[in-house]
Regions:
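Core catalytic machinery and nucleic-acid-binding channels of phosphodiester-processing enzymes
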Residues: 2-7, 12, 16
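Inter-heme linker and motif-flanking segments adjacent to c-type heme-binding CXXCH motifs
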Residues: 2-4, 21-241
Length: 241
């Protein structure tokens, strides 16, 4: 390829013109790994960085960076990117396994070492870590639980678009992915908690601690949106951060 030459002539080639990308609806070219597989598969072979630090080399997730996109409750209770998405090697292996018929996938995956015996194949942007893989029956995760290798099956099961028993999206009460309530933002204490602070005077998820009247006209006595929601908030220690 002459990618650098094209770019220097002010005619850059879009990566997704060859590498398929579900996020853009780009079909790519047959025989090429999709965009996410190509990127993660390559870097996993050359980057020897552990845990979430590997992700932060490219993604804006560093705790001391300018964006700090991972500012929800999970890092506050000691979790990093790899607890849900796997190590860089595991993340890449799942993508490569989904395209195992491509020669480049076979070449890239053979050198990768993972802590999981067999990483299940997955499609990028469509199959992501399943929340209920750790929060089984919407309960507190068991010690040592991990979201790795429990991918959702369909786009409609993604946290950002998933709906509860009443048709409400999860994010309507819990906030956006990676900034779940109560979120911590270094650029403003409750900058990501505007909605619960406005309606409930608390940074906790909407309706937490049996504050259903934030939305409902009367006290609710059962878990209508999902099981196990009428209970005290578990991780109150994060409120002191």
């Amino acid at each position: 390829t002459d990618l650098y030459g094209s770019a220097s002539r002010k005619k850059p080639i879009l990566c997704q013109s060859c590498h398929a990308d579900p996020a853009l609806g780009a079909p790519g070219k047959k025989g090429h790994n999709n965009f996410s597989t190509a990127l993660h598969g390559w870097h996993a072979n050359y980057m020897y960085v552990e845990g979430g630090r590997a992700c932060a080399m490219c993604h804006p997730a560093a705790s001391d960076g300018n964006t700090r996109c991972n500012r929800g409750i999970h890092p506050q209770v000691g979790k990093n990117c790899s607890n849900c998405h796997g190590t860089l090697e595991e993340h890449a292996t799942g993508l490569l396994n989904a395209q195992k018929d491509n020669p480049s996938s076979q070449r890239l995956v053979k050198n990768l070492k993972t802590t999981v015996a067999e990483v299940k194949p997955r499609s990028p942007w469509i199959q992501e870590p399943e929340c209920l893989g750790c929060h089984r029956s919407f309960k507190q995760p068991e010690k040592g639980s991990s979201g790795v290798n429990t991918w959702n099956e369909a786009f409609t099961q993604l946290y950002r678009v998933r709906t509860d028993n009443t048709g409400m999206r999860c994010a309507a009460c819990h906030n956006s992915p990676h900034s779940e309530y109560p979120a911590v933002n270094a650029f403003g204490k409750n900058q990501d908690n505007t909605q619960p602070m406005q309606y409930g005077k608390s940074p906790l998820p909407i309706g937490a601690e049996s504050t259903c009247k934030v939305c409902h006209m009367k006290e609710m006595e059962y878990s209508g949106h999902h099981p196990n929601m009428v209970r005290p908030f578990r991780n109150r220690v994060v409120l002191s951060h």
